[in-house]
């Protein structure tokens, strides 16, 4: 296949970052995450970057047209000639329509949207399992990375652990609910556009990637 213009979707904790890394190792395309391109546009003082900075400094949300402009500028760069892996954009249907238009203008239409699906209950368990040693700051996970001796820190031998507010189940569930509301219309839209590929993310990292690679090899 000559190009590979992709979007990677998935809820927090679904393993998007890990799978993005694996895609980049196998395919010669840049990983374009909205956070990174915003920071770069602001640092380089591009027209759109300066525009975005005004909103961010005032504590306001950056409007779609500015976000779309920053994405368009990034997709017009030379390193996207073989394709790109978009992460964190689009966030809503208006942005999805804008991306379609950008793709037509730059002759870089989307080839596929990979959605890593994991049930929210599993994600709550993954994301809310983290706890920290109060004495030395070592981090543990109740499922994936327990201390060797229960209740005792491997690093300093301390017994006092705590959980950050961000990692508490109610907070995690709230964050997931917000993301589900954002993602569901996009998943429906890309399903209708015949661009959507759902991958079961509740498995070993390598098994998930095998499925993703199979999809990409056949695009």
Swiss-Prot record:
Coiled coil: none annotated. Gene3D superfamilies: P-loop containing nucleotide triphosphate hydrolases. Its EC number is 2.7.4.3. Pathway: Purine metabolism; AMP biosynthesis via salvage pathway; AMP from ADP: step 1/1. One of its GO terms (biological process) is AMP salvage. The keyword Transcription regulation does not apply. CDD domains: ADK. Residues 129-167 are annotated as: LID. AMP binds at residues 34, 39, 60-62, 88-91, 95, 164, 175. Pfam families: ADK, ADK_lid. ATP binds at residues 13-18, 130, 139-140, 203. The keyword Magnesium does not apply. SUPFAM superfamilies: P-loop containing nucleoside triphosphate hydrolases. It catalyses: AMP + ATP = 2 ADP. InterPro entries: Adenyl_kin_sub, Adenylat/UMP-CMP_kin, Adenylat_kinase_CS, Adenylate_kinase_lid-dom, P-loop_NTPase. It is found in: Cytoplasm. Catalyzes the reversible transfer of the terminal phosphate group between ATP and AMP. Plays an important role in cellular energy homeostasis and in adenine nucleotide metabolism. Monomer. Consists of three domains, a large central CORE domain and two small peripheral domains, NMPbind and LID, which undergo movements during catalysis. The LID domain closes over the site of phosphoryl transfer upon ATP binding. Assembling and dissambling the active center during each catalytic cycle provides an effective means to prevent ATP hydrolysis. Some bacteria have evolved a zinc-coordinating structure that stabilizes the LID domain. This is Adenylate kinase. It comes from Lactiplantibacillus plantarum (strain ATCC BAA-793 / NCIMB 8826 / WCFS1). The lineage of its organism: Bacteria, Bacillati, Bacillota, Bacilli, Lactobacillales.
């Amino acid at each position: 296949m000559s190009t590979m213009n992709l979007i990677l979707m998935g809820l927090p904790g679904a393993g998007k970052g890990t799978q993005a890394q694996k895609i980049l190792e196998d395919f010669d395309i840049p990983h374009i995450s909205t956070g990174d391109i915003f920071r770069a546009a602001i640092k380089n003082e591009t027209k759109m970057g300066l525009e975005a900075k005004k909103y961010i400094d005032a504590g306001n949300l950056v409007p779609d047209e500015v976000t779309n402009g920053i994405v368009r500028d990034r997709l017009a760069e030379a390193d996207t000639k073989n394709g790109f892996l978009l992460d964190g954009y689009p966030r809503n249907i208006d942005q999805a329509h804008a991306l379609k238009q950008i793709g037509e203008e730059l002759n870089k239409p989307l080839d596929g949207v990979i959605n890593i699906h994991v049930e929210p209950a599993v994600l709550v368990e993954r994301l809310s399992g983290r706890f920290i040693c109060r004495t030395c700051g070592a981090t543990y996970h109740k499922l994936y990375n327990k201390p060797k001796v229960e209740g005792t820190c491997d690093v300093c031998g301390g017994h006092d652990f705590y959980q950050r507010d961000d990692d508490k189940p109610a907070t995690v569930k709230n964050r997931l609910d917000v993301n589900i509301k954002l993602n569901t219309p996009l998943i429906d839209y890309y399903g209708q556009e015949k661009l959507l590929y759902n991958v079961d993310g509740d498995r070993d990292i390598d098994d998930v990637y095998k499925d993703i690679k199979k999809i990409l090899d056949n695009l």
